[in-house]
UniProtKB/Swiss-Prot annotation:
Residues spanned by motif RDXXRA motif of the pArg binding pocket involved in allosteric regulation: 340-345
NCBIfam families (alphabetical): PRK01059.1-4
Lineage: Bacteria, Bacillati, Bacillota, Clostridia, Eubacteriales
Family designation: Belongs to the ATP:guanido phosphotransferase family.
Gene Ontology cellular component list: extracellular space
Gene behind this protein: mcsB
Domain Phosphagen kinase C-terminal: 25-257
Function recorded in the entry: Catalyzes the specific phosphorylation of arginine residues in proteins.
Domain of life: Bacteria
PANTHER family given in the database record: ARGININE KINASE 1-RELATED (PTHR11547:SF38), ARGININE OR CREATINE KINASE (PTHR11547)
Protein name from the UniProt record: Protein-arginine kinase
EC number(s) reported in the record: 2.7.14.1
Pfam families membership: ATP-gua_Ptrans
Residues annotated for ATP binding in this entry: 28-32, 93, 128, 179-183, 210-215
Catalyzed reactions per annotation: L-arginyl-[protein] + ATP = N(omega)-phospho-L-arginyl-[protein] + ADP + H(+)
Species name: Syntrophomonas wolfei subsp. wolfei (strain DSM 2245B / Goettingen)
């Protein structure tokens, strides 16, 4: 996949849920490593001169590296990127909303065209190295992110303190600089009214539950990001092991509640899922929030064998494909709200039809 296809097409490596572990509940795993250069001011303090110097150092490190996966990545500079394309990168989860909206000097993205590896340049930190994989694969995501980290550190001098670890713009990231997160689909926990209690317990265990695009975003379509809070005093391996163990408990609770809903609310659940499928396959206008809510019900119905089998890849693609920037990119022109809702309904009808296995 070329970098042009990254913007023109939706499917990315993390969307491949066909064979990934626990992929009916764990949509994706992400590991992010925050790094800063030792002799360059933090991003919010950069001026034009230091920003230019910083970008030159990053460019040279990328060009000099002989590590295969780093050489396969391509550099996208934001000064040459439209606001629409920045939003597309946010909708693909490759950059944060803050990164897209920032006006700081010299920002960009090093990205592997399949989206499995990405390095945000000059977001909150100089570098945020990320690996995205489908299903529950935190160890593998960390391994691949660490390889990029090691390759860059051969060429760059990272800010590191022997006592505190890696130094970051935000004190909560000091230490490993690592944020491990899972994108979870938890409809049964939400429907049963257990989310408040469960999420409070997760917070007490040192984990954070956020919305679909991370910090400061709302949970839509029963998608939640579960991530570690603590980066100091724990090793990367310990952080991953803890998050994996606790997430397994959340997964088990979700499975038990799905079974309970089926046993105790069979007809109500069938009606809810059937109505969602009917609306999505026939609607001519649909908003983003309504679509994500109904797609959550359809995904639940597929996972529980209550409606025709639809490829998990098709459902994962739809979550991104129906977002405003992707719809506008497909249309090739500006769209008002009604036009977007009409295009969204069309995209969903087509995808659900073509995504049905055996059709």
């Amino acid at each position: 996949m070329s970098i042009k296809k990254l913007f023109a097409e939706t499917f990315l490596a993390w969307m491949n849920g066909e064979t990934a572990s626990q992929s009916d509940i764990v949509i994706s795993s992400r590991v992010r490593l925050a790094r800063n250069l030792s002799d360059i001011a933090f991003p919010h303090l950069l001026n034009q001169e230091s920003g230019q110097k910083f970008m030159q150092l990053i460019y040279e490190a990328w060009q000099k590296s002989e590590f295969k996966e780093l050489k396969q990545m391509e550099l996208v500079t934001f000064e040459n990127l439209s606001a629409l394309d920045r939003k597309i990168l946010v909708e693909k989860h490759l950059i944060s909303p803050n990164h897209a909206q920032s006006t700081a000097f010299y920002q960009g993205l090093l990205v592997k065209p399949d989206g499995s590896l990405a390095v945000m340049i000059n977001e909150e930190d100089h570098l945020r190295i990320q690996c995205f994989l489908p299903g529950l694969q935190l160890e593998e995501a960390y391994r691949r992110a660490q390889e990029i980290d090691d390759a860059l550190e051969k060429e760059l001098d990272f800010a590191f303190d022997d006592r505190r670890g890696y130094l970051t713009s935000c004190p909560t990231n000091i230490g490993t600089g690592m944020r491990a997160s899972l994108m979870l689909h938890l409809p049964a926990i939400t429907i049963s009214g257990q989310s408040g209690h469960i999420f409070q317990n997760l917070n007490q265990l040192g984990l954070t539950v956020r919305g679909i695009y991370g910090e400061g975003t709302e949970a839509i379509g029963n998608f939640f990001q579960l991530s570690n809070q603590i980066t100091l005093g724990q090793s990367e391996e310990d952080i991953n092991a803890s998050l994996t163990t606790i997430s397994q408990q959340v997964i088990e609770q979700e499975r038990m509640l799905r079974k309970s809903l089926r046993e105790q609310m069979k007809y109500q659940l069938e009606d809810r899922i059937g109505r969602a499928y009917g609306i999505l396959t026939h609607a001519r206008l649909i908003s983003s929030n309504e679509a994500l809510t109904l797609l959550s019900d359809v995904r639940l119905g597929v996972d529980m064998g209550m409606i025709p089998r639809i490829s998990p890849n098709a459902l994962n693609e739809l979550v991104v494909d129906i977002r405003p920037a992707h719809l506008q990119k497909k249309a090739g022109s500006d769209m008002d709200a009604v036009s977007r809702d009409a295009k969204r309904a069309e995209v969903i009808r087509e995808k659900l039809q073509t995504g049905e296995e055996g059709s």
